[in-house]
Every structure is written in C-alpha cells, then in structure tokens.
Amino acid sequence: MASAHIEHKLSLLPDLPGCYLMKNLNSQIIYVGKAKNLKNRVRSYFKSSHTGKTARLVSEIADFEFIVTSTDKEAFLLEITLIQKHQPYFNIKLKKGTGYPYIKITNERDPQILIVSDVRKDGGYYFGPYPNVYAAQETVNFIQKVYPLRRCHGFQKRPCLYYHMGQCLGACFKTVPVAEYDAQIKRIKSFLNGHVETVKKQLTKRMDQAAADLEFERAAELRDQLNYIEMTVEKQKIISNDNTPRDLFNFYLDKGWLSIQVFFIRQARLMKREKRLFPVVSTAPEEMTSFILQFYNRKNNVLPREVLVPNGLDKQVLSDILGIPVRTPQRGQKKDLLDMAQKNARIVLEEKFRLLELDERKTTGAMQEITDALGIPAGHKIEAFDHSHIQGADLVSAMVVFTDGQPNKKLYRKYKLRTVDHADEAASTREVIRRRYTRLLKEHAALPDLILMDGGEIQLEAAKDVLENELGIATPVAAMVKNDHHKTADLLASAGDQHLHLDPKSQGFYLLQRIQDEVHRFAITFHRQVHTKHSLSSRLDEIPGVGPKTRNKLLRKFGSMSKIAGASLEEIQSLGIAKNVAQTVKFSLAGGGVTPKHYQKGAT
C-alpha cells in the first residue's frame, strides 16, 4: 500500500507524456521510466498487484518525481539520457546496453556514414540518438544508396563491389575530390536535419508505380523506406540539431512563488535538469536575472556556449556579464524547448501549492486539533519525553521537539539519569523534567506550548508535580496513552480523567502517533548506545591488570569486544599497554577465563 506522501503525489500527476524517476528511502534514483500518460502509468505501480522484479521495485519506492515532455518520442529519448546518467539499479536491460544509436559521418579524407553507439570528440558529424535501432540502420542503408560516400576499406587499386552498385564514390581505386564529398555531406546533413520532402515524393512516386506494375514486394520495400525515414528524421525537441553546449532557463510565477527550470543540453541531448522554488520579492524578470548570475557564480557550474532565456529578461546585461551569447528563440526547436521548460515549471509550482495545503493540514492544522482537544490555547512547540532501561539498568531519558507539527532534531536532548538506580517511572520523570525546565528557567529560554509524556497517569502526575509545585511553570502537560498492542491510543489530560478520544483518522491523531513513535525511537537508540558501552566497559574491567585508562584506550581504538579480540598482540601493545597486560586481554577475550600461570606478570 502506498504511503500518504505517495498517494498525494499521485493525485498531482498530469495526463501528459513524460519520464518518471523512482527513488528509495535514501533519495537514490532506482528506476527511470517513460509514459504516454504519466498519471495512468505511475499510478499503475501502486494501484495494481505485481510479482517478481516489479514487486521488488515497488516495495523500495519511497518517492518519485517526473519531467513532462510534449510527445511520447521525446519521453523515449529523455528516458535513455536519464538512464545513462543515473544508472538506476532496476533499469538492468537498458543499463547494460550502449543506449540508442547515432548516425555518424566520419571526419576522414574519405568519409563514411556509420551507425555508432556513442558520441566522441573526433570532428565527426553526429545525428540522434534514435529510439528505433532497426529504422536507423535502414535509413543509413537508404542514404548509402542515394547519397553514397565511401563504403569500402579505402584504396585497393580496383573498384569495390559497392562502387559497381552505385553505393561508393570510388575511394577504392581513385582520388575522390574533397568538393565532391563536401557536396554529398551537405545533402546528407540536410536530409537528416529534416529536409526530406523531395526524397519522400520520389519514393512515393516509385512506390505507386511499383504497385501499378503489380510489383508488390518492391512497393512494400519502398513503403518501409518511407516509414524508416519518418521514424529517424522526425523532428525532436529533446534532441537539438547541433552539438552546441547550451543552458536553458524558464520560469512560472504565481501567488508570490517563482518556479524555475534549468535544462542543460550537451551533445545534442538534455543531460540534466534543475528545478528551484522560492518566494520572491521583486519582479520575476529581476529575480530571474539575479538567479542566473548567481547560478554561474557557483563553483561547479561551467558556462556553456549559449544561454536561452524567455522574453522580458535583460539579455544584454546577462551577455555582458557572462561573456557568452544570451538569446530568446522566437520559433523552432529551441522555442519549443523553452515552452516545455515553462510547462514543467508550472506543473512543479502547482504541485507545491497542493502539497503546501496538505502540509498545513498535517502540521499546523494537526497541532491545532491537539490543542483544541485539550482545551488549551493554540501553540507551536511540543516537547515529548520517554524513558528506557533494561530491568532497571542503564536508565536514560530522551526528549524530542516538534515545531508546528515538524520534528526539530537540533533541539532533541538525551539524559543519563543520575538520581535513579532502578526502574521507577515517577522518579525518572521527576528528574528529567526537573533538569530540563530548571535549565530553561535559568537561561531565560522559551518554554514549550505543550509537554507530552509517553506513558500514563504515573508519568503525567510526576511531571505536573515538578512543574507546578517546584518550578511554578503552568505549561500544559498530557500523557500519550498506548493500547494493548503498544500502539498510540489517545491523550490523557489528568489523573482519573477520561481519555480525549481523538479521531484515529484525524491529522491530530497522526501527529500524536509520529511524536510518540519518534520519542520512543530516540530513547531506545540512546539506551542501546549506553548499554553497549557499559557492557564493554564492565567486561574489560573484569580483566586483571585493566584499569580505566587501559579500558578507555582499547574502546577508543577498537570500539567492540570482537575487534579487540581480533587484534594482534602488537596492535594492543602499540597503544602503550604492557605486553603481559596485552597477553591477559587476548587470553581473557578468547574465552580463557582465569589467567594462566605463564601469562602472569613476570612469566617468561
């Protein structure tokens, strides 16, 4: 079942094509996919049952984001770029491959046209990448027939087979003029950049003639050639027609918030996207100009050869300061990319507003529900306490702080109890409450609006007694009560009181659960640390010849009994520990029990 966070993000998905990026709990991208309809595709992961690898993927998804494109093909091309960049774990098939192919015209005296898997800085002309590998290969075959270059291995004193077939200019047996190659390359570049109408008309005419002559196989071949040209030479927004490194900025402004999208186009591909959201004071053009200048002032941002921005920005100022052309495209491929960036900026901002509304209900709204239920003034800050021990040993307390419904971990505190040496909930509560709020009074620090105790009447009454009768503090206190399954059940305002019966489906109840789970987790974690350290110290203290200084040296260096036991005699002695003591430590931790005679001091 999807988390509440995922559910709300699913409701924000648009009915548009694009790519989605699935993330795990560590915010690592674990899967990249594409969709004709983002809303339907992404929702299908969480609304349908799955098996095998898909089930494993869904179980690890903690969050996702998406990028909107204009067509399904753009999503295809963007998908491979994102996979190559992030190498997601679950994209195994695409990860192991070399990606979609490119069509390349080589930079040689006698150039060739080839299918290649990557782009190199070798002076060649690259076109692509192309999602349909077979269509790209067939298009190259077509070009080799219509616009031949060199198709053989080079000079071999006699014409090759391809020359006789009209698919090679003859570098195999003669010197082909550079001008002839240049003219042919110009035609190929024009063809691959989309100027295909003349060729398509010729093919269509030949296809119709073949059909009229009842040469149906030949007509089918010509029809397929037309389809391959459509698939490979079709205009693309994600892929530009040149390899100029450029960055593209666009924005969307609403309700005092500015949403910015930055597209990084490298090697004719959208290599990276950054998105930013912040409230603004000045006008959008002023904020954008300032943002762009600060953006390139960062250490890791390298200037491209060109920057594209929307209308309204002072391009001359930007260009003068950055030292590169800053332009606003008015039509064509670059303008379409700029529009796509603005569309994504708008979608991100709309999502932000919906999440803000949701967060307000979850945080400040939830806080309001709790204070209303207790009948106390609305507040912002809650401090919650819990104790932890094992059969009365290593007693500790912990405090967590929630501000406007959000954990404020910088204010968390840990307490080793000093006056309690056995399991006594009331005494533990008195000590930690006394220590915490005596200090706040002494420092003239702000008191919380509500104090919550994890427990029941015992903890509640002990806390109230210290606050009211010893410290004169009137801060409201309540106890977070658990049910028989050790789950959050309700709030208790005073001893003998009826439970408040918060609605289990309310945001206030969910906040109470989060606070109780967090303070319990924090206390348990601290107790384990203390108990582990004490266990190590106690066992070392039992070894003859090991005093506090030696014990501390060993713990600081090795950290655990297993590592001390696994250390060599020389490693232990390197800490300034005498050889006979080091031998005793080694023997004792190896399970030897009483130190043998030959390990006693003075033995040889």
From Swiss-Prot:
<dbReference type="InterPro" id="IPR000305">
    <property type="entry name" value="GIY-YIG_endonuc"/>
</dbReference>
<dbReference type="InterPro" id="IPR036876">
    <property type="entry name" value="UVR_dom_sf"/>
</dbReference>
<protein>
    <recommendedName>
        <fullName>UvrABC system protein C</fullName>
    </recommendedName>
</protein>
<dbReference type="GO" id="GO:0009432">
    <property type="term" value="P:SOS response"/>
</dbReference>
<feature type="domain" description="UVR">
    <location>
        <begin position="197"/>
        <end position="232"/>
    </location>
</feature>
<dbReference type="Pfam" id="PF22920">
    <property type="entry name" value="UvrC_RNaseH"/>
</dbReference>
<dbReference type="InterPro" id="IPR047296">
    <property type="entry name" value="GIY-YIG_UvrC_Cho"/>
</dbReference>
<dbReference type="InterPro" id="IPR035901">
    <property type="entry name" value="GIY-YIG_endonuc_sf"/>
</dbReference>
<keyword id="KW-0963">Cytoplasm</keyword>
<dbReference type="Pfam" id="PF08459">
    <property type="entry name" value="UvrC_RNaseH_dom"/>
</dbReference>
<dbReference type="GO" id="GO:0005737">
    <property type="term" value="C:cytoplasm"/>
</dbReference>
<dbReference type="InterPro" id="IPR010994">
    <property type="entry name" value="RuvA_2-like"/>
</dbReference>
<dbReference type="Pfam" id="PF14520">
    <property type="entry name" value="HHH_5"/>
</dbReference>
<dbReference type="GO" id="GO:0009381">
    <property type="term" value="F:excinuclease ABC activity"/>
</dbReference>
<dbReference type="InterPro" id="IPR050066">
    <property type="entry name" value="UvrABC_protein_C"/>
</dbReference>
<dbReference type="InterPro" id="IPR001162">
    <property type="entry name" value="UvrC_RNase_H_dom"/>
</dbReference>
<keyword id="KW-0228">DNA excision</keyword>
<feature type="domain" description="GIY-YIG">
    <location>
        <begin position="15"/>
        <end position="92"/>
    </location>
</feature>
<dbReference type="InterPro" id="IPR001943">
    <property type="entry name" value="UVR_dom"/>
</dbReference>
<keyword id="KW-0267">Excision nuclease</keyword>
<dbReference type="GO" id="GO:0003677">
    <property type="term" value="F:DNA binding"/>
</dbReference>
<dbReference type="GO" id="GO:0009380">
    <property type="term" value="C:excinuclease repair complex"/>
</dbReference>
<comment type="function">
    <text>The UvrABC repair system catalyzes the recognition and processing of DNA lesions. UvrC both incises the 5' and 3' sides of the lesion. The N-terminal half is responsible for the 3' incision and the C-terminal half is responsible for the 5' incision.</text>
</comment>
<keyword id="KW-0234">DNA repair</keyword>
<dbReference type="Pfam" id="PF02151">
    <property type="entry name" value="UVR"/>
</dbReference>
<comment type="similarity">
    <text>Belongs to the UvrC family.</text>
</comment>
<dbReference type="Pfam" id="PF01541">
    <property type="entry name" value="GIY-YIG"/>
</dbReference>
<dbReference type="GO" id="GO:0006289">
    <property type="term" value="P:nucleotide-excision repair"/>
</dbReference>
<comment type="subunit">
    <text>Interacts with UvrB in an incision complex.</text>
</comment>
<keyword id="KW-0742">SOS response</keyword>
<keyword id="KW-0227">DNA damage</keyword>
<dbReference type="InterPro" id="IPR038476">
    <property type="entry name" value="UvrC_RNase_H_dom_sf"/>
</dbReference>
<dbReference type="InterPro" id="IPR004791">
    <property type="entry name" value="UvrC"/>
</dbReference>
